[in-house]
Amino acid sequence: LMWRVAQREAKTLFLILFDVDYFKQFNDMYGHQAGDDALAAVAKCIGDNIRRPLDHAARYGGEEFIVVLPDTTPEGAASVAEIIRSAISDLGIEHSGSEFGHVTASIGAATWTPEEDSEVSAVIRVADEALYAAKATGRNKVELSPVHTS
């Protein structure tokens, strides 16, 4: 829905993908109930840290979450992503399988601009590539893609 609104109103849209670091190991060490509890805490944390009425957050699959920020600058999206990354880390959920000692998240973000003629799946792919770059370069960090072009 937000995608269609952004297209119709010719406004920029930012997609932010979050992936809980080492989540399979977390489930293996602490059990699936603890994993479910950790995901619920992360989801609440994400929801608590998006402020504007049209910003949306959802579970994207497994241990991944997506945030949609309509009419947002790259600087604004980076700020929201960093606030959420820090807040997830500050939850302090113990995770001895992580080099950080607690649950963290890696984050990738991408933008869609009105000048583009791409589908939402292309922007999700670019955000996913940024997410994997964050994981490959140390985890528990935010990686913004360059401005997406179709």
Language-model segments: residues:
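Conserved long alpha-helical elements within nucleotide-processing catalytic cores of c-di-GMP signaling
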Residues: 3-15, 24-48, 58-62, 66-67, ...
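Catalytic core regions of nucleotide second-messenger enzymes
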Residues: 59, 88-105
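Catalytic-core segments of nucleotide cyclases and related cyclic-nucleotide turnover enzymes
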Residues: 74-82, 96, 112-150
